[in-house]
């Protein structure tokens, strides 16, 4: 037994037990190395043992900052990366597809080198079936089976511990299940519930459901959970912040949910981790469940919604 805090309670990703509130490191490229280290160390102090990253964050700089701040790593720390894109630095979208099997392998090798690991515990295959931000064309349109064969080979070689998948519709997840998928990362929040069937499958299969954009999109022109009047009312009633209500609803909504909210601020980090202590009663959950959502996936057409939003 341990008295170490477990924000949000205990969940799992593959065979690893993790706190249900983790940390998404993407924004650490946008701050100084010292500030990045402070955020990472504070996260671990508060019980975070699931950190999400990618070699295309930076490029590679976020991985290097994680290593500088936390290595030698705590025994219980699960670092999750993703492959399938590469950093370009171009605006408004600094990423391009890198979907070919050789590119997936190269990205894993980058993770190993940048993070100083012999094996990345979990690596997500970031497909281009759903958005946002990055699409695939030409030789970047790659068969799922070819990609999974490379991921399985990497797992068999001990370079990765387990395989996840990201930005995919339900039919692609079903096709991928025989590969031993341990987590799914798709866009999902209180205001975008187009993935309910996906959540049902994850729950039935014991797969970690790890939503990105858990508080609504950070892109211009898209709704944010913290602006919703129902969320604001409940936050005021229970003495929580709107963000904590939105994250707390996600934890209550599905038992295999793991959260990886990102921030470069220690204040916001502590707020996000505090969502694990938010208690929503049945009345509050019913009110949040009743919030009207579009009912369709806003990212179903890949890059277009992002491009339109950036022009508003």
Where are the model-predicted features located?
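Feature marks short, surface-exposed loop/turn motifs that line or immediately flank catalytic pockets
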Residues: 27-29, 57, 85-87, 126-132, ...
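Short, acidic/polar
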Residues: 31-43, 99-115, 169-174
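A structural motif
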Residues: 48, 117-120, 160, 181
